Amino acid sequence: MSSYLFTSESVTEGHPDKICDQVSDAVLDACLAQDPLSKVACETATKTGMVMILGEITTKANVDYQKVVREAVKKIGYDDSSKGFDYKTCNVLVAIEQQSPDIAQGVHIGKVNPEDIGAGDQGHMFGYATNETPTLMPLTHFLASELVNKLTELRHNGTLAWARPDAKTQVTVEYKKEGHKITPVRVHTIVISTQHDEKVTNEQIRADLKELVIKAVVPAQYLDDNTIYHLNPSGRFVIGGPMGDSGLTGRKIIIDSYGGWGAHGGGAFSGKDATKVDRSGAYAARWIAKSLVAAGLADRCLVQVSYSIGVAKPLSVFVDTYGTGKKTDAEILAIIDNNFDLRPGCLMRDLQLTRPIFQKTASGGHFGRNDPDFTWETVKELKM
């Protein structure tokens, strides 16, 4: 038996990069709400007093981009310049063009049946699942995400009146390894850095974070006298949001996925409609991995899929059960082939990916969420 430490982080909805993810997905949702067949590739950048959206959108929808952007920023809680950003006064720049006709003719133009729609680009995507938590997500990532969600909840409901929208969490867990099996033993270290108002003391911040956030989220069995806490360790975090750091869409792809576990193909999710396999392929890979682990076929599972632009059928499917599989990887690949149609149009149909449900995926994680709109989290009963 051996042991090791593993760490995952997360950020709140008010982090500059996460602002951008949410704005990009708010634009996507606004298009899909009027035209479910919208083709959207929307990036966002932000800095002090400014949000810029840029990209390629082909849609029948009539979208007020200024309104969509400001509403997304308002929802996060940036409603006063004292917080580092104000949805009412920020400058919104729009640089949106139509999707390239070269891409359109190769992917979807003239293709009536879902089975014929090609992938919007080449690339490889990964999905991961593990039985160490009920959500079949890694414990490090689960706890980092839940700390963020609790902190955000307490800020919005006024319990933490001193809290501001921008914050980060990080959790280190000690694992033991026996053969191929890994088991989380204890939480080694917790880091929380949260933006705050001018008046609150560090003593109150640290007490509130420990009592109201950490103890509400982390099961007592994982905390002990040796757990290390770094709570606002810099000593001051008044300047936050886009005033403190610039933000870009797609800069938090590991937080969006599995916190460093498994693997990542590099493509971001937010701002992309489901013909973009960076998103739909990654959702499908999670759907597969979670279904395999839920069926007891493995304790842990990594799935890779790859695509070529304009081609419907995936080029490859790969599975790794880390030595925990109850069947061979070849047998599991056959099960995948018999149960999942990974052509992009079929994924859009089976996972209902033309609905305007993506803004809420852009904060708190795309995976491991208990929400019926996250269809890729619904375990599929497998035909063996």
Curated annotation (Swiss-Prot):
GO terms for biological process: methionine metabolic process; one-carbon metabolic process; S-adenosylmethionine biosynthetic process. Catalyzes the formation of S-adenosylmethionine from methionine and ATP. The reaction comprises two steps that are both catalyzed by the same enzyme: formation of S-adenosylmethionine (AdoMet) and triphosphate, and subsequent hydrolysis of the triphosphate. GO terms for cellular component: cytosol; extracellular matrix; methionine adenosyltransferase complex; phagocytic vesicle. The keyword Magnesium applies. It catalyses: L-methionine + ATP + H2O = S-adenosyl-L-methionine + phosphate + diphosphate. Its EC number is 2.5.1.6. The lineage of its organism: Eukaryota, Amoebozoa, Evosea, Eumycetozoa, Dictyostelia. L-methionine binds at residues 56, 99, 245, 276. GO terms for molecular function: ATP binding; metal ion binding; methionine adenosyltransferase activity. SUPFAM superfamilies: S-adenosylmethionine synthetase. InterPro entries: ADOMET_SYNTHASE_CS, S-AdoMet_synt_C, S-AdoMet_synt_central, S-AdoMet_synt_N, S-AdoMet_synthetase, S-AdoMet_synthetase_sfam. Binds 2 magnesium ions per subunit. The magnesium ions interact primarily with the substrate. Its cofactor is Mg(2+); K(+). The keyword ATP-binding applies. Belongs to the AdoMet synthase family. This is S-adenosylmethionine synthase. Mg(2+) binds at residue 9. PANTHER family: S-ADENOSYLMETHIONINE SYNTHETASE. Pathway: Amino-acid biosynthesis; S-adenosyl-L-methionine biosynthesis; S-adenosyl-L-methionine from L-methionine: step 1/1. K(+) binds at residue 43. ATP binds at residues 15, 166-168, 234-237, 245, 251-252, 268, 272, 276. The gene is metK. Pfam families: S-AdoMet_synt_C, S-AdoMet_synt_M, S-AdoMet_synt_N.
